[in-house]
Amino acid sequence: MKKLLLFFLAIPVLFTATAQQNYWSQYVGTGKIITDKSVARLSFPKEFKLFTASLPLLKQELFKVVNNNAAHTNIISLPNTDGALEEFEIVEASNFDAELQAQFPEIRAFSGKGITDKYATLKLSYSPQGIQTMVFRSGKENEFIEPYSQDHSVYAVFKSHRNKAQLPWSCTTPGADLEESINIQVQNSGIVARSGGNLKTMRLAQSVTAEYSNYFGATSATQVSLVLAAINNTLTRCNGVYEKDLALHLNLIAASTNVIYYNASSDPYSNAAQMANWNTQLQNTLTSVIGEANYDVGHLFGATGGGGNAGCIGCVCTNGAKGSGYTSPSDGVPAGDNFDIDYVVHEIGHQLGGNHTFSMINEGTGVNKEVGSGITIMGYAGITSYDVSGHSIDIYHETTIAQIQTNLNSKSCPVTTTIVNTTPVVNAVSNYTIPISTPFALTGSATDADGDALTYCWEQNDNSTTTNAQSVASPTKLTGPNWLSFRPTISPVRYFPRLQTILAGLNTTGPMVGGDAGVVTEALSSVSRTLNFRLTVRDNAVFSSSAPVSVGQTQFTDMVVTVTNTSGPFTVTSPNTNVSWAGNSAQNITWNVAGTTASPVSCANVKISLSTDGGLTFPAVLIASTPNDGSQSITLPNTATTTARIKVEAVGNIFFDISNSNFTITASASCGTPTGLAENNITINSADLSWNAVAGA
C-alpha cells in the first residue's frame, strides 16, 4: 500500500498571493481519486504530496517565454516535497527541431533557475496532457512532479528515492563494443573532462514500438501528438542531465514522426521477448526511412521486456551504427523517473561514448571506477549484486564525462555553438601523504566569472582490479575504488569517510538506502596505497534554446592521496568519553601521534578545535597551531553544551581525527552587577556600604 502524505497548512501565507501563482493549491479532496495508470508502476514512490493544478493559468505563464513572445524569462512557482511553493526563473528549452516545434506548438519544454533555492535547477515539459518536472537539488535527492489523477488535474510531488530490485531490468551493452579510439584517448593525459565554453547540439531520431504508442492512447498517426508529448517528457529530463554534465542538448528531428508505429502486427520490430533483434531492426529502419545523413543518434523506446542495449558504444555520428540503441521497461510503464533517468540516460550514455562504471564485473575498459554496483548513471545500482544503493544518483561519473567529452570532440556531427556562459576556473589541489586508518578531508575551490551557483563533486578515479565480493570498499584493498560517489554539493569539502561515520567512531560506511546488507561503500585504508581523486565543478547554468543561448559548463582538477603504513592511525585519545568539564577551565587534550611527524607524512604541527553541536561544525579554534607531540593544554570557552567534540587536525595536511563521544561543558556562573548599593554611617574617614548579594557569586 502506498503511503499518501497530505500536507495541510493552517494558514495559506506560503502561497504568495500574486495572481500568477494561483495555479497551484494543495489537494484537500476526500473522495477516491481515479489515478493515472503510470501510478501503478512498481517504482512509483510510497511517499508523496498532492497538489491540484490549473493548467490554463500555468500555461499562460509558461508561454510568455515561448519564442521570446513577451520576454526571454518569466517567474513561475512550483510545489516542493516540503509542501511549499518555490520560485523559478524559466526560459524556453525546446527539445524539438524548428520544423517539429512549428508543427506541434502546444508541446513545449522549459528550463528554470531557482530563486527560492539558488542551487536548484528545473526541467519542465508541457503538453495539453499536463506537465512533468525534474528539479535538480544540491547535495540531496532530486524532486519530480508527475500527474497523479487520470484527468491530470492532481499532481504528485516526490523525491527520487526508488525501491530496490522491483524492476528486473538489464543493460546488455557489452564493454567490448567500445570504439577503440575512445579507449585509447581516455587513457591519455590529454583527456577532456570539461566543457569548452560552448554548447553541442545533436539530432535525435527517436522511434517507438506500437506498444509504446498504444500505452499513451495512440492507435493511429492522427494521435501522434500523444506520442510526441510522452517522448518530450522523457527527453526533457534526459536533456537535463546531458546539459548539466556534458554541455550537450539533443533535438528530436521532425522525421521521427515517420518512425512512430501504432500497429504491433505491422511495425518493423520483433515482440519484446525477442528484443535482441531490435538493434539491427532499428538501424535498418532509420537508414531506410530517415536516411543516415539526416540524424546523428538514433534510439528506440519499447513498452515491455525490461532491457536496454546501445548497439555499440560511442558510435554517434557513425553511419550504419549510430541508430541502434533501445530502451524498454520491465513493468510495462515506459515513463517516469526510473525509465527516464536510470534507463534512457544510461543507454544513450553508451551511445555517446560511456562504458559501465561498476566494478562487481570488470569489463576491461579502464573505467570500472565505482564501488560494487556503482551508483552513478552508468552503474547498476539496485539491479545487480553488491548493490551499494537501491537506485542511481542523477549524475554521470567523472570518468564517464571524460569518455563522452573525448568521444564527442573526435566527432564532426555535433553542432558547436559558442555561448556567453564561461567555464568555471578550478584551482589546483596539492597532493598529500597521510597515515593509515585516519580520516581526511579534501577541499577544493573555484571561481565563476558569471557568478553562477557552483557545486562540487569529489570522486575517486582508480580503475578496479578486483570483482564480485572484492569489488566493495575494504580497508585492505590495495587498488581500485574504495570511495562511493555522492551528489554534487555546495560545499567544496568532502570528508572521508562520511562525517556520520567518523562521528560514530568507524572507519567504514555501509550501504546507502536500499543497498545490499553488508556492502561497504567507504573504507579508510589500513595498508599502503595510492588514491587518485578528481574534483568536478558544475556551474549549473540552465539550457536556453532561445537567444541568448546558454548551457551549463564543467571543469575539473586532479590530485593524489598517498596512504603510508609507516604511520598511523592518528587518533584523539582524550577526551574520548562523556566527561563533564567546566567552562573556562584548563584541560589537557591528548592524541596518538603514531609516527606522523616523520617522513613521508612530516606533520610538525596540529590545530585543535571545538564543536558544540556533536561534531557537525567546529567554529571554535582552541589553538591554531601547536607541536604535534600528542598533548596540549587548552582553555575551554564558557559555553554550556552536552554535545561537545574535539578535533585535532594536521596543519599543512588533510588528515584529522574527532573524539569518539560527546562530552559536556558546564558554564561557570558569571558575576552580575550588584544592586541596592547604599551608604550608611558616613564619617570623614569611613562609611558603611551595603548591597544586594548576587546569587552564585
Give the residues covered by each predicted segment.
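The catalytic-center signature of Zn2+-dependent metalloproteases
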Residues: 253-277, 317-394, 459, 463-474
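Pro/Thr/Ser/Gly-rich low-complexity, intrinsically disordered linker/stalk tracts
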Residues: 669-696
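Fold-level signature of zinc-dependent metallopeptidase catalytic domains
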Residues: 22-34, 154-313
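Structural beta-strand segments of beta-rich domains
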Residues: 438-442, 585-589, 685-689
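Proline/serine/threonine-rich low-complexity linkers at boundaries of modular beta-sandwich domains
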Residues: 408-425, 561-570, 668-671
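N-terminal prosegments of processed precursors
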Residues: 19-149, 276-278
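Exoplasmic/lumenal beta-rich domain surfaces
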Residues: 251, 457-527, 600, 607-609, ...
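Extracellular acidic, Ser/Thr/Pro-rich low-complexity tracts
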Residues: 434, 445-450, 462, 539, ...
